[in-house]
């Protein structure tokens, strides 16, 4: 593939200036190419201008606002903007950061790029994928004339260099799917196809553009004299396709009854995977395994309460793109996926026995379809202490506190 060089471009401009009439204005490089034929009739040009066989593109990759109060832009049925900070009593101290990481999204700074050439047919099926890796937010590379599709997603970086996300690029060239694998922990509630829960994914952002026209007329190109290249800018907006949920079980009147939590919890009915190109989550419902921590004497509007809190990342609800859901359904404030969503947390009581509490949080998950705070409140004066011998108490099925605040125990 031939690339126009700075030397050739400058030599061409110099030759044109010397041989053409002095009465013509010197035009900018990008406009000069388009007007070269009618202006330069009878002029001698040396050296001959040879354009590259394709176009050079600079892709800038901005990212949507990562602040949770901007991304969680829900509006209630009453038209009141959602303020998650007024619901979140667990907090996020330095020890939480050490155990679980940051509370919100982290800014990525490196990206994987897949380029698909479709010839003269925009949005045609892909036959080959060209790979690029970018440090920073700009990709500069060469393209053949014709139409291109471009997919970008952030590189995954973890503290221990072990990532949960797996990317499937082999099944089809027309899309890339991300998923995670199963843990060794059991999944008992509303994950009928799987006996174990799944690892939560890392923060994942993606952008996909189709039918990018790299044409011989150099429409939308400009000439960069410093680099000696024709350039076309494409802005690709990366959006989150994994969603953060902040969970908290608030114990009123605990009085030392619950003293600890196991450390692992599950949120069920969530998607197993996501298609990067569309951002639409898969149809298989799973339980996502995540970590929780027990805090004593937290302040809740002046009341001292104990809280079991945690943060989980997931692909969101099945069969939807959480980021774009509200944009495509004006006025809709709830995503009804037809699934039940349970959060289970195993707690240890003061007598040394443990019990798994299972909370129906379907309404909260469907209302917070791209993440948010999930809260369950328990009045421990109404919760019996397990006393069965053998170290294991009961599994308590507790309905969503927004559905009336009653508690149903399956003893």
Regions found by a protein language model. Give the residues of each.
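Bacterial Sec-dependent N-terminal signal peptides
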Residues: 3, 35-72
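Short, low-hydrophobicity acidic/polar segments
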Residues: 119-239
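Hydrophobic, glycine-enriched assembly/anchoring segments
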Residues: 355, 361-411
